[in-house]
């Protein structure tokens, strides 16, 4: 029912934007925003680009860094405007060292829960080889890159008794014209409760936290965000929880599984199109 209401509202809005001659007024956002979802199995990396600008959220495992760098260069990006590391688990920070050594990075945002691991050590060593001072996000941070607005929401505690790394995940909202996307890292129960309490509103796309693992608070998160698409990073060996998939079906949310191949999610500021290699994509009405 909510999706039908969205479609109706969108139709009304678009009708209101038409001139007497039947032509639409100016676009909600100039150009396009693209989210490239790497297919790294149970590891996360998302490249968000607008015209001439690039932001990377997480870097997958150590062996994924080379592929990220290669993709950036193939697409003509010699620098990153910002690197956001949601937390320091190896499947999120692993490729960061390679990225920092190979690509000019202007800004690094990180979580507040460091880990004693070789991946963390390599990341810090690579960071020392640059002139960047990484920012540990402790307050809500909003900034604009190109025509996209990014808001980063930090964990609300300095430490968590259970799953401290995952529950320290940064959450990032990306807004472009009338479209919006929410990335939640590996948030588990304690962090999910915090994100839900923020009452962030609706999003066109929600990244399901922690590779699609089940948590009762996913019900609250989905009903708050009311997405049309839900993105999950998992693997054939460790697939998403069936209870999570059943919930998405129940809420009429289309699941996008990165393990089935890389995804490109493109917004023109009003509609969103999702495609895999060889696909043309299907337009999606923006959230109301």
Go through each PLM region and give its residues.
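Repetitive helical segments and hydrophobic/amphipathic motifs
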Residues: 11-15
């Amino acid at each position: 029912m909510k999706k039908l209401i969205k479609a109706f509202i969108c139709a009304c809005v678009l009708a209101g934007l038409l001139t007497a001659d039947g032509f639409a007024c100016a676009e909600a956002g100039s150009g396009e925003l693209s989210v490239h979802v790497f297919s790294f199995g149970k590891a996360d990396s998302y490249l968000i680009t607008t015209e001439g600008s690039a932001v990377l959220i997480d870097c997958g495992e150590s062996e994924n860094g080379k592929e990220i760098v290669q993709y950036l260069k193939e697409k003509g990006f010699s620098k990153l405007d910002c690197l956001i590391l949601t937390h320091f688990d190896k499947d999120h920070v692993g490729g960061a060292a390679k990225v920092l050594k190979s690509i000019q990075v202007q800004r690094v945002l990180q979580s507040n829960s460091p880990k004693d691991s070789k991946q963390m050590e390599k990341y810090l060593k690579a960071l020392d080889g640059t002139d960047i001072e990484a920012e540990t996000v402790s307050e809500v941070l909003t900034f604009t890159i190109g025509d996209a607005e990014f808001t980063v929401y930090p964990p609300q505690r300095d430490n968590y008794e259970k799953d401290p790394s995952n529950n320290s995940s940064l959450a990032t909202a990306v807004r472009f014209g009338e479209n919006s996307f929410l990335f939640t890292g590996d948030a588990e129960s304690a962090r999910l409760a915090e994100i839900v309490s923020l009452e962030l509103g609706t999003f066109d796309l929600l990244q399901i936290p922690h590779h699609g693992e089940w948590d009762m608070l996913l019900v609250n998160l989905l009903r708050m965000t009311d997405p049309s698409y839900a993105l999950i990073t998992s693997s054939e060996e460790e697939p998403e929880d069936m209870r999570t998939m059943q919930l998405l079906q129940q809420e009429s949310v289309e699941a996008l599984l990165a393990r089935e191949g890389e995804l490109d999610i493109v917004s023109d500021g009003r509609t969103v199109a999702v495609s895999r290699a060889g696909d043309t994509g299907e337009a999606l009405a923006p959230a109301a």
